[in-house]
């Protein structure tokens, strides 16, 4: 039995890597595990700031060992992070990280919630964070989440008493949780949000502490632990064939875009919880001690508990279907209790168990991935009763409207199939993340539908309800309509079904820089999402920009095909920046959307409709040099940005670097974190520095502190120590302290105005110590901190130059910040006032 449990449980976990929509097959061990959860009426809520902040060990322990309903409330969706597996950043990264969180919860058994807070990047303190987030709005979201989820215990990941010692988002999440703990039960607090919920008072609030928060293991061992609970989260689950930490490691490993793939850990391990509010449990190994978590918690629950506790005690692992009659009876009694909260939760759990013990397979799917409002689609229904119990399918409804009303006996292992043709309402919303439907602010998403706030994702467009009769009791079971197809290399795949426009358009470049008056061709690609689509496309642009044509026609025969149209755009003669929007006109509808698909094996494919627009900038910029060699680090879009202002950029494979191989380039640029992630640089650094010594320019962008120190003794030709210094306020004052240096004079004059309009931050991981050969160019600081001069350093080396910069060009250039382009051009141009054009670089 244990071997069977292992196989089935691993299949469930690994299945999330193929498609999160795939129906799960439940072993008797899985069903028994769910019955244990069914018989526990207690709830825990974990609160932190970002995807991957959560302690999956504790979430898994609460869900799988305690059997509590366990949720994770993440303040943000992680939009401000970086992406180690693909190109998605900002809003699109938030969509990906949302799905990775949901994948993690499918593994550890938790549920997922969010507030409307945006991950706007690193913040040094909660004061800044809460100002940008709009504290009252996000506090209201936390209060509402508590009222809806109704946790008995809340666990904070971070300490609310230590502002400035960690990410401001981290501390803010804990501060909001502490405040919301009491406000959730105050009817005068956020009373406008009580329409669909009610006040709630959690019993206990904990801080998930560890030795790390004390500074060292030695200090933690000596600390007063009188207010600490400790639980062994290394427990082994014989029924599942895995330990708690193995499950937790698999859950954490869903955060692939953040590089959280990790090895499993095994063995006993303690987790500590500091009581912040509420009474101290007598048993310091039980968060729920003294809280009624049995069926007697709800009026009328004693009869239900008597039935379900007996099912648990006498569970038949060889034939779980023998419990069907008792489970149906418990379901029937459950419908009569007055506590709507527990009725809804436990009815959902109980229906899933009934479906599993009866061997029922119910699904509704389409064989097309998407369609349009007003179009017809076919929904395929399948129902199989794989037991000898009498089960009747009485009817099937789609979104509440009955579409099949012919009672059918589901005979043992006989497949029932039916096709339903339905029409998508013309008023149907397009598929997409609800939090991106409207333009938000720097710190918050704009969501007008209050019922959606907190949900991890937008509910899918179609839901099929199978109305069944089991043991004489009517039981409705809902199934989301999915898209199902097969691939020879992957087999059966389930993905979400999408509703999309008839056509969308895409501007090839999101930022278009005009460095002079020369017109540029603007490609616009139209993609059809139905057969035989024709219409026109127009571009909208600001004043003083001239288009060669107001609109152009297109015609596309096949769904999924594309057609590219070319417009010519002439910039104004003076510096200017504006937006450029493409609009598709079809059948009286104007569509200014680009369809972005996010597809990875470990999460369901996501369709996001983003504004089809670009930023166009007329920039009076000068440059010297033509050919740039770029050594990619962790990944950035700087090369594409440099090509926008006329440079030819060649990506260099570090393995190909040899003596003299770099001499054909006018400058060598190393991408972000190159010395952290490109091990070959350890052996190629001599050639890079020799290139500078012989007259070249080497530009090194930021690397994180600590990692390279033991690997590279000569990241620079002179002494240079990288710190964790950073300036997170993108609007902080910048002083030019080396006013005569070429970096701020040639070929573009740099003034404080060139630091206007920067995004997210000034920079990060600035050096704090350097030799006298280096000249610091800029001075800046965050509020309340000492000024730092290490953001941009330049040193002559032999006949050339070495530049180290922690300025966030990897963010500013793709965002089209004019001053960032001018400054980077100066960096590339240094020492080239008498440049002799180098021979054409091949490739």
Language-model region placement:
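Long beta-sheet-rich domains in secretory-pathway and surface-associated proteins
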Residues: 366-617, 622-623
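A glycine-rich, often tryptophan-bearing local segment used as a flexible ligand/cofactor-contacting loop or short
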Residues: 673-755
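Positively charged n-region of N-terminal signal peptides that target proteins for export
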Residues: 1-5
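Catalytic beta-strand/loop cores that center a nucleophilic Ser/Cys/Thr
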Residues: 724-816, 839
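Metal-dependent de-N-acetylase/amidase catalytic core
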Residues: 6, 20-45, 125-129, 135-362
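Active-site rim/loop-helix segments in enzyme catalytic domains that contact anionic ligands
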Residues: 21-148, 171, 178-182
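Bacterial N-terminal signal peptides
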Residues: 7-16
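Aromatic-Pro/Gly-enriched surface loop or interdomain linker
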Residues: 590-671, 702-704, 811, 829-842
């Amino acid at each position: 039995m244990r071997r069977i449990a292992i196989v089935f449980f691993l299949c469930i976990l690994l299945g999330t890597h193929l498609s999160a929509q795939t129906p799960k097959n439940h072993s008797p061990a899985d069903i028994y595990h769910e019955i244990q959860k069914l018989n526990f009426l207690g709830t825990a809520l974990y609160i932190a700031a970002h995807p991957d902040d959560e302690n999956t060990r504790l979430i898994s322990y609460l869900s799988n060992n305690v059997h509590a309903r366990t949720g994770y409330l993440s303040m943000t969706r992680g939009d401000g992070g970086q992406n180690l597996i693909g190109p998605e950043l900002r809003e699109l990264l938030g969509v990906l990280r949302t799905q990775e969180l949901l994948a993690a919860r499918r593994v550890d058994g938790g549920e997922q919630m969010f507030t409307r807070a945006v991950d706007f990047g690193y913040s040094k303190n909660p004061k800044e964070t809460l100002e940008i987030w709009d504290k009252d709005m996000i506090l209201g979201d936390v209060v509402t989440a508590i009222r809806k989820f109704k946790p008995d215990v809340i666990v904070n990941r971070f300490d609310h008493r230590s502002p400035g010692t960690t990410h401001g988002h981290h501390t803010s999440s804990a501060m909001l949780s502490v405040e919301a703990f009491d406000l959730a039960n105050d009817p005068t607090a956020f009373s406008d949000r009580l329409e669909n919920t009610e006040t709630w008072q959690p019993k206990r609030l904990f801080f998930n502490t560890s030795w790390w928060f004390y500074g060292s293991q030695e200090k933690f061992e000596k600390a007063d632990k009188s207010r600490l609970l400790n639980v062994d989260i290394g427990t082994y689950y014989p029924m599942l064939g895995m330990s708690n930490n193995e499950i937790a490691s698999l859950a954490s490993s869903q955060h692939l875009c953040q590089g959280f793939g990790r090895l499993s850990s095994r063995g006993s391990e303690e987790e500590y919880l500091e009581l912040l509010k509420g009474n101290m449990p007598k048993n310091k190994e039980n968060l729920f001690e003294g809280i009624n978590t049995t069926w007697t918690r709800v009026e009328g629950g004693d009869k239900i508990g008597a039935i379900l506790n007996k099912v648990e005690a006498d569970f038949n692992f060889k034939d779980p279907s023998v419990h069907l009659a008792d489970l149906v009876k418990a379901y029937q009694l459950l419908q009569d209790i007055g506590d709507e909260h527990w009725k809804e939760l436990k009815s959902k759990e109980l229906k899933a168990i009934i479906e599993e013990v009866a061997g029922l397979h119910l699904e509704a799917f389409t064989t097309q991935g998407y369609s349009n409002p007003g179009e017809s689609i076919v929904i395929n229904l399948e129902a199989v009763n794989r037991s000898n119990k009498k089960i009747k399918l009485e009817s099937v409804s789609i979104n509440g409207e009955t579409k099949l009303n012919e009672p059918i006996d589901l005979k043992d292992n006989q497949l029932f199939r039916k096709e339903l043709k339905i029409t998508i309402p013309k008023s149907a919303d397009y598929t997409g993340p609800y939090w991106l439907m409207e333009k938000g602010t720097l710190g918050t998403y704009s969501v007008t539908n209050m019922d959606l706030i907190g949900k991890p994702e937008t509910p899918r467009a179609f839901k099929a309800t199978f109305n069944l009769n089991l043991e004489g009791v009517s039981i409705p079971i809902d199934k989301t309509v999915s898209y199902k197809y097969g691939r020879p290399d992957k087999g059966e795949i389930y993905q979400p079904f999408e509703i999309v426009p008839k056509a969308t358009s895409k501007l090839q470049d999101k930022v278009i820089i005009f460095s002079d008056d020369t017109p540029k061709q603007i490609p616009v690609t139209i993609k059809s999402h139905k057969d035989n689509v024709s219409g026109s496309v127009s571009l909208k642009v600001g004043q003083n920009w001239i288009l060669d044509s107001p609109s152009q026609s297109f015609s596309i025969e096949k769904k999924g095909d594309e057609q590219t149209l070319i417009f010519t755009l002439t910039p104004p003669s003076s510096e200017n920046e504006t937006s450029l929007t493409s609009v598709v006109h079809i059948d009286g509808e104007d569509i200014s959307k680009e369809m972005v698909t996010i597809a990875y094996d470990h999460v369901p494919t996501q369709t996001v409709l983003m504004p089809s627009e670009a930023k166009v900038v007329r920039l009076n910029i000068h440059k010297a040099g033509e050919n740039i060699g770029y050594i990619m680090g962790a990944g950035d879009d700087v090369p594409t940005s440099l090509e926008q202002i006329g440079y030819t950029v060649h990506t260099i494979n570090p393995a190909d670097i040899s003596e003299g191989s770099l001499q054909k380039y006018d400058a060598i640029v190393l991408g972000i974190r190159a010395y952290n992630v490109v091990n070959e640089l350890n052996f190629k650094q001599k050639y890079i520095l020799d290139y500078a010594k012989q007259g070249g320019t080497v530009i090194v962008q930021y690397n994180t502190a600590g990692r390279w120190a033991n690997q590279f003794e000569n990241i620079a030709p002179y002494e240079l120590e990288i710190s964790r210094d950073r300036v997170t306020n993108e609007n902080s004052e910048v002083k030019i302290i080396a006013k005569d240096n070429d970096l701020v004079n040639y070929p573009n004059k740099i003034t404080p105005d060139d630091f206007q309009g920067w995004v997210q931050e000034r920079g990060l991981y600035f050096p704090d110590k350097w030799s006298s050969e280096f000249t610091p160019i800029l001075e800046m600081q965050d509020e309340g901190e000492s000024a730092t001069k290490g953001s941009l350093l330049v040193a002559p080396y032999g006949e050339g130059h070495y530049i180290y910069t922690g300025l966030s060009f990897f963010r500013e250039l793709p965002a089209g910040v004019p001053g960032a382009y001018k400054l980077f051009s100066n960096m590339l141009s240094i020492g080239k006032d008498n440049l002799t054009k180098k021979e054409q670089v091949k490739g």
